[in-house]
Amino acid sequence: MIATPLWNLHVPSRLKSWFDTVTVAGKTFRYTETGSEGLINNKKLLHIQANGGVFHGQDPASQYIKTIFGFLGIKDCSELFVEGMDHDPENSESIVAAGIEKAKELGKTF
């Protein structure tokens, strides 16, 4: 599970640094004659992201996370976007409450 805010359309620098640390040839992926192959198989990813705006999963950060984990071999990815708190601050509490309910539902199958 990865839970992150959206900062300036990307992941926080500490998370980027962690990705750089764990993306290691021979450990988490390998090179083959036909290209790279992820070595982390049979794992799931749940990506939870808080956004001030509304992007519907099309922001660069969520695409980056999905791409990195796919490269490492994790194909079973679920996403939960709790978004719009800055766009609609009057409804931020209900946006967060709805996100918590969605997280509870996702947690039943994760």
Positions of PLM-derived features:
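Helix-loop-strand module that forms the ligand-binding subsite of alpha/beta enzymes
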Residues: I2-Q63
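Glycine-rich phosphate/pyrophosphate-binding loop and the adjoining helix
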Residues: G57-F110
